[in-house]
C-alpha cells in the first residue's frame, strides 16, 4: 500500500505553479492507485525572498509534513510525498535518518542543495536542504542524516564552495552520464532506500521544472532506478518541483511522464496487501 502526503503550503516557492504542480501530480496518483492523499498546508503566493524569511514562514507546513511523514514511516506502507519544493525535505530527511539510521538517501537533483547560509549566493532555501539534513546548519527542523548516507544522483550544477563542502563531508556523487541502474545499486548495496527527486535533474524539456540546467538525466534513467531498487527495500519517495504549465494539456502530459517513471515501484507497492 501507499501513504500519500501532499505539500500545499508555500515552502520557499519562487515560481508561481509549484503548489499546483504538486496538487496535479497527487490527483493523478490518487486516480491511478485509488489513494486518498493527506494534504498539508495552505497555498500562499510565491516570492523571491531570502531563506531567513522563507524558513520561518514555512514553519507550520514543515511541522505538519514532519508529523505526517513520521506516522507513515513508522508503518509498513510506502511513504510517498509530493512536494511543491525541495525545501519540504528539511522536515522529512531527519525523520528518515532517525527511523532508518542505516538508510541510503538517493538525492536525485540537478543541484547539490549543499550550500549553507555562509556559502549561498542566492539565499534560496532550496539550495541548502541536504546540508541542513546533514547538520551543516540548523534549520530548526532537525538533522541526523550522515553525509555518507547521501548519494547525489544526476547533480551537475554545483557551486564551487558547495562542491568543497560535498567533498569534505563525503557525500557521494553520481553524474548524469554515469547514473545507471547498476551504479545506483552499487551505491545503496543492501541498505533501505529513500528516494528524493527534483525534476530539474532531467534534461530541460522533459518535465517543466524550475532552475533547469542542460546535460541532465532522461526519464528512462529515472524509471530504470525505480525498476532496479527491490520493492522491499524502498521505504519512501519524494517527488518535488513540478512547475505546472498553465496549459492543462501540457500539464497532463508532464504528469503522465512522471507517473510512467515511478510506475515500477508504485505498482509494486499498490499491489501489496
Curated annotation (Swiss-Prot):
An example GO biological process term is:
arginine catabolic process to ornithine
Superkingdom assignment: Bacteria
Q: Which CDD domains match?
A: Arginase-like_1 (cd09999)
The GO cellular component terms are: cytosol
Sorted alphabetically, the keyword list is: Antibiotic biosynthesis, Hydrolase, Manganese, Metal-binding
Q: Which cofactor does it need?
A: Mn(2+)
Q: Gene3D superfamilies per the record?
A: Ureohydrolase domain
**What is the protein name stated in its UniProt record?**
N(omega)-hydroxy-L-arginine amidinohydrolase
- List the source organism: Streptomyces lavendulae
Q: Which gene encodes it?
A: dcsB
